[in-house]
């Protein structure tokens, strides 16, 4: 092969690979752009590589997406901020492609580059780019333009700023709904850069146009603008211009707009302040909680606790609580589930007496809901109620339902109960645990779902830590060891798992007197899976018991297992023997 000029070689490889039929090769070369740019040097990168990329904007979307991302961090490879403008042409091309994710990444990269450019470069290169995109024939260019106005605006002259505001206003009235959507979506960002004198006169006029758009997809994006613009306006302007829009949107004919209001309600309340929230937004929120569209009720129900934090307890009880009671028996399981995921947080807001009077009956009905996710959401947040009403009342009112759920037909509900048991046990005390929950813990060890059995074994360890080895020796160990003769090998295996977890908590004496004989006996089991788990368990017991026990009992058992016909049993037995030899060598 003829000698190739070394600096030319990387660009030649890149060009070859970019034209290759294999998309993976083209992708790899794009992702190596920074390496190639280093090899070429800054000047050749500017003069050869970037123009080449500008001409290649008709590739697969995956390649173009990678290119858009790479160019966003390319300033150091073209000679620094002084030459950042050379990166604009390829990104401008990418802003006009059909694929949305490519355009969005190109816009993101343009924002990164534009925010670092010098003011004169912004005026000479970036602003003309924005204008070209905003005046583009193809709607994709105009959509992309909306996302970069806020970067262009900051470093402009007053004349250019006036021009940019007028151009943005035109985009808000564009014939294409996609462009108006982009204008609505980015209005908040643009507004943060616009001087306060133009907020009411110009930006709010654009906003008003968008809120009255005949397309619900534009109006729902204007909802997000309410919160963003509300933070920029003076309080009195916010009440005069934003509040009526929110109230109207909460009654919009499109459920998607109402859904967006419900979803953004907390942010909207922050924008208009506490007084308007109490007088104007409480009725709006109540309407959303009682909306005839389930999707809207789901969004509203999920915000009930956050919304109540903005109110005093009396208002919450008077206006919101009746809706919460209705939602707890809503015809949609998803509404009930959304409510269950947040309702426990209302307890600290309402206080002990109101929680007992109003919320406990709702908790109880949700705990007995036919839909497992509803029950699950309540169980996972029980500690929030416990902190408010105390454990005694909790045990009297909710615990019977919790115990019932311990045998729920859905394993995820049983799992949630298991994970809650150590907390319950620590707060209720030993006596209550022995009466109500002890038998359940053993029952879970023999559950037909592995995740439940594993969680139950971990549970035993946590209970032993909570109540101490003596209690565990009396109430847990005998029941666990009784299972060693269970006809099902998976349940026998669970005994080994429970021993491995409990042994470090129980200490050397109980491990040697109670656990070890059972483990040695299990080494003679007919099932290979049991035997190699015995080998692994014996290895984990080495640090817990005395060296004499290791030499006398554990080693001999492992030697027997190392001669087992099953290859896995022999492997784990030898691993354990090596571990013994290693620890012996370290001690000597």
UniProtKB/Swiss-Prot annotation:
Ubiquitinated. CHIP-mediated ubiquitination enhances phosphatase activity after an abiotic stress such as low temperature or darkness. It is found in: Cytoplasm, Cytosol; Nucleus. PP2A consists of a common heterodimeric core enzyme, composed of a 36 kDa catalytic subunit (subunit C) and a 65 kDa constant regulatory subunit (subunit A), that associates with a variety of regulatory subunits such as subunits B (the R2/B/PR55/B55, R3/B''/PR72/PR130/PR59 and R5/B'/B56 families) and the regulatory subunits TON2. Interacts with CYP20-1/ROC7. Also interacts with phosphatidic acid (PA), a lipid signaling molecule. Interacts with CHIP. Interacts with SIC/RON3. Mostly expressed in cell-dividing tissues such as apical meristems. Ubiquitous, with higher levels in roots and flowers (at protein level). One of its GO terms (biological process) is ethylene-activated signaling pathway. InterPro entries: ARM-like, ARM-type_fold, HEAT, HEAT_type_2, PP2A/SF3B1-like_HEAT, PP2A_Regulatory_Subunit_A. It holds the Pfam family HEAT. The A subunit of protein phosphatase 2A serves as a scaffolding molecule to coordinate the assembly of the catalytic subunit and a variable regulatory B subunit. Seems to act as a positive regulator of PP2A catalytic activity. Confers resistance to phosphatase inhibitors such as okadaic acid and cantharidin. Involved during developmental process such as seedling and floral developments, root gravitropism, and stomatal opening regulation. Disulfide bonds: none annotated. GO terms for molecular function: salicylic acid binding. The gene is PP2AA1. It comes from Arabidopsis thaliana (Mouse-ear cress). The keyword Repressor does not apply. The lineage of its organism: Eukaryota, Viridiplantae, Streptophyta, Embryophyta, Tracheophyta. This is Serine/threonine-protein phosphatase 2A 65 kDa regulatory subunit A alpha isoform. Belongs to the phosphatase 2A regulatory subunit A family. One of its GO terms (cellular component) is cytosol. HEAT repeats lie at residues 2-42, 44-80, 81-119, 158-196, 197-235, 236-274, 275-313, 315-352, 353-391, 393-430, 432-469, 470-508, 509-547, 549-586. Keywords: Abscisic acid signaling pathway, Auxin signaling pathway, Cytoplasm, Ethylene signaling pathway, Nucleus, Plant defense, Repeat, Ubl conjugation. Each HEAT repeat appears to consist of two alpha helices joined by a hydrophilic region, the intrarepeat loop. The repeat units may be arranged laterally to form a rod-like structure. It comes from the Eukaryota.
């Amino acid at each position: 092969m003829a000698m190739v000029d070394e600096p030319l070689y990387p660009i030649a490889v890149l060009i070859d690979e970019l034209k290759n039929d294999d998309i993976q090769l083209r992708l790899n070369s794009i992702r190596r752009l920074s390496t190639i740019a280093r090899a070429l040097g800054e000047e050749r990168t500017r003069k050869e590589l970037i123009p080449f990329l500008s001409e290649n904007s008709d590739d697969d979307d995956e390649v173009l997406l990678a290119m858009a991302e790479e160019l966003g961090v390319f300033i150091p490879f073209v000679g620094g901020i002084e030459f950042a403008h050379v990166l604009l042409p390829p990104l401008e091309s990418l802003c006009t492609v059909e694929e949305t994710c490519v355009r969005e990444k190109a816009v993101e990269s343009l924002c990164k580059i534009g925010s670092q450019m010098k003011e004169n470069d912004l005026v000479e290169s970036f602003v003309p780019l924005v204008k070209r995109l905003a005046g583009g024939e193809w709607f994709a260019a105009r959509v992309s333009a909306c996302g970069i106005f806020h970067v262009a605006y900051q470093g402009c002259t007053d004349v250019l700023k006036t021009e940019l505001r007028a151009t943005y206003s035109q985009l808000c009235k564009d014939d294409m709904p996609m462009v108006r959507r982009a204008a609505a979506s980015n209005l908040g960002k643009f507004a943060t850069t616009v001087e306060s004198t133009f907020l009411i006169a110009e930006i709010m006029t654009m906003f008003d146009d968008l809120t009255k758009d005949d397309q619900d997809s534009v109006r729902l994006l204007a909802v997000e603008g309410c919160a963003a613009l509300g933070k920029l306006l003076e309080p009195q302007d916010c009440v005069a211009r934003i509040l009526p829009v929110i109230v109207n949107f909460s009654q919009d004919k499109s459920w998607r707009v109402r859904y967006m209001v419900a979803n953004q309600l907390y942010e909207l309340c922050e924008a208009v302040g506490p007084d308007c929230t109490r007088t104007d937004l409480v009725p709006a929120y109540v309407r959303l909680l009682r909306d005839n569209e389930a999707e809207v009720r789901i969004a509203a129900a999920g915000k009930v606790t956050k919304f109540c934090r903005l109110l005093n307890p009396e208002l919450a009880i008077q206006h919101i609580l009746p809706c919460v009671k209705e939602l707890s028996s809503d015809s949609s399981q998803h509404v009930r589930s959304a409510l269950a995921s947040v309702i426990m947080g209302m307890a600290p807001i309402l206080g002990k007496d109101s929680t007992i009077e109003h919320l406990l009956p709702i908790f109880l009905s949700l705990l007995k809901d036919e839909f497992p996710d509803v029950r699950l959401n309540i169980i996972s947040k029980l500690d929030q109620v416990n902190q408010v009403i105390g454990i005694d009342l909790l045990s009297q009112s909710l615990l019977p339902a919790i115990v019932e759920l311990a045998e729920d037909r859905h394993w995820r509900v049983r799992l949630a109960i298991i994970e809650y048991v150590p907390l319950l046990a620590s707060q209720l005390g030993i006596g209550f645990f022995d009466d109500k929950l002890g038998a359940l813990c053993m029952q879970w060890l023999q559950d037909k779902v592995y995740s439940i059995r594993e969680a139950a074994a971990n549970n035993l360890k946590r209970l032993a830590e909570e109540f101490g080895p003596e209690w565990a020796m009396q109430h847990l160990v005998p029941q666990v060891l009784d299972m060693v003769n269970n006809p099902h090998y998976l349940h026998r295996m669970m005994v080994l798992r429970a021993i491995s977890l409990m042994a470090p908590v129980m200490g050397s004496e109980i491990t040697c007197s109670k656990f070890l004989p059972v483990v040695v006996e299990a080494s003679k089991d007919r099932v290979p899976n049991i035997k190699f788990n015995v080998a692994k368990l014996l290895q984990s017991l080495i640090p817990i018991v005395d060296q004499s026990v290791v030499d006398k009992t554990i080693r001999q058992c492992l030697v027997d297992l190392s001669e087992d016909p099953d290859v896995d049993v022999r492997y784990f037995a030898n691993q354990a023997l090596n571990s013994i030899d290693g620890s012996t060598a370290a001690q000597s």
